[in-house]
Design a protein with these regions (language model features):
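Hydrophobic core of transmembrane alpha-helices in multi-pass small-molecule transporters
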Residues: 5, 86-103
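Helix-loop boundary and gating motifs at the non-cytosolic
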Residues: 1-41
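Helix-to-loop junctions at the C-terminal end of transmembrane segments
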Residues: 46-60, 148
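Cytoplasmic helix-loop-helix junction between adjacent transmembrane helices
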Residues: 96-131
Length: 198
């Protein structure tokens, strides 16, 4: 649930400011910005296909969530730190399409997990998770608006990069916990195995 809330933080804090940063702050011409958005949309479609193909082949979908989260942290971190037209265009067109696929990856993992663990309540729980995502859209924009007005509009990218890192941390902890439990279970099974007489 927390991962979807922070996913909502990412979208709610940045999507409304793309044109402000690109056109008003960095001075990208309107026509160029339109091309950037078109290229980003096409790259997003390609990223969805690639990640969909990978999700059927990786051992654990959570690895893709971590990869998307770290990609997003690097991309938005670059915009925040470099603050020029080239970095904004490259990140928007080539990096963020893969990072923004994190929502579908989180939902796919949640559906698989909930269907296996609580098949009777899976649909309800998925709806609840979508509500958590929507809550961020309701409460985050005023705060990032105040932040952008009182400091710099680039600060919103620092917020989004931090949210990506939080998601990566959540899923890395989940992976580590499952790995530790599996290792402990394997060790316990080895200790409980009967000794064959010779």
């Amino acid at each position: 649930g927390m991962s979807l809330f922070f996913n909502g933080v990412i979208f709610a804090s940045t999507l409304n400011y793309g044109a402000i940063v690109g056109i008003d702050t960095l001075g990208i011409p309107n026509a160029t910005y339109a091309v950037v958005l078109m290229a980003s949309s096409l790259a997003g479609a390609a990223a969805s296909v690639i990640l969909g193909w990978l999700s059927d082949r990786v051992r654990d979908r959570r690895l893709l969530v971590v990869a998307c989260a770290l990609t997003g942290a690097i991309g938005f971190g670059a915009i925040y730190l470099i603050r020029d037209q080239l970095s904004f265009i490259l990140v928007t067109c080539a990096v963020m399409p893969f990072a923004f696929a994190i929502f579908s990856q989180i939902m796919a993992h949640a559906r698989v997990h909930l269907t296996a663990a609580q098949p009777g309540r899976a649909d309800f729980m998925i709806s609840a998770l979508r509500t958590v995502f929507a809550v961020a859209w309701a409460i985050v924009p005023p705060f990032v608006g105040i932040l952008a007005a009182s400091t710099s509009v680039f600060e919103i990218y620092a917020v989004a990069a931090a949210a990506f890192l939080v998601i990566a941390a959540i899923y890395l902890v989940m992976l580590w916990t499952d790995r530790a439990a599996w290792t402990a279970g394997k060790a316990g099974g080895a200790r409980a195995a009967p000794v064959r007489p010779t």
